[in-house]
Amino acid sequence: TWTLSRDADIGLTFVGVNFYDGQGFMVRKNSGVTSTSQFKDGISACTNLGTTTELNMRDFFNSKGISYTPVTFEKADEVVAAYDAGRCDTYTTDKSGLAAQRIKLSSPDDHVVLPETISKEPLGPVVRQGDSVWEDIVRWSLNTMIEAEEYGITSANADSMKTSENPAIKRLVGAEGEMGAAFGLDNEWNLRIIKQVGNY
């Protein structure tokens, strides 16, 4: 997640956002809880130790005046196992993470991700500060995938786009221009990205 402290304090540069996520909560269906507005004092919540997720959880419960017990672990698999074993009433992390971790539960269909989102989590590629060439390459790799989607270029049709009538598409797939030269790359670097990972 792109945060001010991570951007300013730990020597990293965030080059863009490729996914906006947000923190949510998962509960057991048989709890009858369908909204965070139903959370009561004494609730226990599993999450990862020392993360923005833990801080967001604290802020959420404090802002609602709900007393809670944090149940924290360093590793995501430990959090999932604890929640699955019933050591906490709810599990909180980014909603994409909840969806992915839910399938690891012993009975995935017995759990539901609640509709509320309590934070904005801009996710994207990160590089170390001080390497401006690598930063540019990573940024323009992200831009390549976004532009490929705008033009309808996929991993399946990327090669055929070399003969497009659109000059911008031809430049993007390396059939015209010298887009890679500024970074010391060959002209098909964008094409290889699209062929390997597709578009945005």
Task: Show where each model-derived region lies.
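Alpha-to-beta junction loops
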Residues: 1, 43-45, 84-93
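Acidic, polar ligand-binding/catalytic clefts
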Residues: 1-39, 95-121
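Bilobed "Venus flytrap"/periplasmic-binding protein-like clamshell domains
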Residues: 20-78, 96
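Extended ligand-binding regions for polar small-molecule ligands
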Residues: 27-33, 37-40, 49-51, 97-98, ...
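Alpha-helical segment that forms one wall of the substrate-binding/catalytic cleft
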Residues: 52-56, 90, 136
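A residue-level marker of the well-folded mature domains of exported/periplasmic proteins
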Residues: 70, 85, 108-109, 131-135
